[in-house]
C-alpha cells in the first residue's frame, strides 16, 4: 500500500517524503541539484549519498550506480543508497552495488523507511 502510493507521487513529493524519513532517522539531509546523487545524508560524521530520481524506472542497470559511486568518491562519502520504488535491478547492478558500498533500498526496505517517518 505504501509502495503503491509512492509510485503515483511526483518527484518533489517523493523527495520530500524521503528527506522527512531520513531526518526522522537522525540524519542531516541536504537535497542536491542535479548529478548522480539527489541527497547528501550526514550522521555521526559519516556521509552517505543517495540516488532516488530514477525511482519509477522499469529496469535499473549498472550505469546509474557507477555515477553514484563516482559522486561518492568526489564527496568523500563512505556509503551510497540507491532507491527504487518499482522495476527491477539487473544482476550486474546488484553485484556492482554490493562491491561498491551501495545499498539498494526497494520493496520492504523502502516501505519500512517510509513508514518510520509517520
Regions found by a protein language model. Name each.
Residues 1-118:
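Mixed-charge (Asp/Glu-Lys/Arg
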